[in-house]
Amino acid sequence: MTPLTYEQAGVDYDKIDPLKVAAQRAAAQTASQLAQHGFSEVQASRGESAYVVDVGPFYLASIVECLGSKALVADAMARLTGKNHYAAIAQDTIAMAVNDLITVGATPLVVQAYWAAGGSDWFGNAERSLALVEGWKRACEVCGVAWGGGETPALAGIVEAGRIDLAASCTGIVNPKQRLSVGDALGDGGEIAVVAVGIA
C-alpha cells in the first residue's frame, strides 16, 4: 500500500508555516492588552496546543480546532452504506478541541460550534443536521462541558457545495494553578495520568 502524505491531501507546510510564524509574532505583540484587565499571558503556552492566561486565582485556557477532512469520510460512508455518521463526526470535532485543551492541565468548561456549509441546502437535510446536533450535545455531556453557542454560516463559493467544515472552540480553567503543564513543567521522566471515561 502506498502511504498517503500531507502534500497529496493538498497540505504543504512549507507554504503554510511562514504565515503561522508571522501570525504568532503579530499575536505575541497583542499580549500586553491583557494588562488593562489585570491579566497576563503565560508565555510558555504561546504556540502550544492551548493558549493560557493568568487571571489571578486560576489560569484561563482556550483553543480552536478544526476537524479537517474527516467530514469527507462521513459523506463517503453515507454513500456506501446509507448510514448517517454525523453524530460520530460531531463527537470527533469536540474531542479534538477538548484533547488540545487538556494538554495544558485545563478542565474544559465551554464549547462553541462552527459549522460552515457550502450552502443552505446542507442544513436542509434534517436527518443529517439533527444527527450533528445530537452528536454534539452527547459529546458535551460526555466531556462535562456546556455548549455555549456557535456559528452556522452558509458559505457558497467558499466551502464546496454539499460539504461542511466543522470546528470547535473550547475554554477551560487550570485550577489549582499547580496543574499547569507547559514549558518547564514538562520534561523527561514526567508522568501524565489519564482517567478512562468508559467510551469505546
Region locations from a protein language model:
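Glycine-rich phosphate/pyrophosphate-binding loop regions near the starts of catalytic domains
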Residues: A28, A35-I199
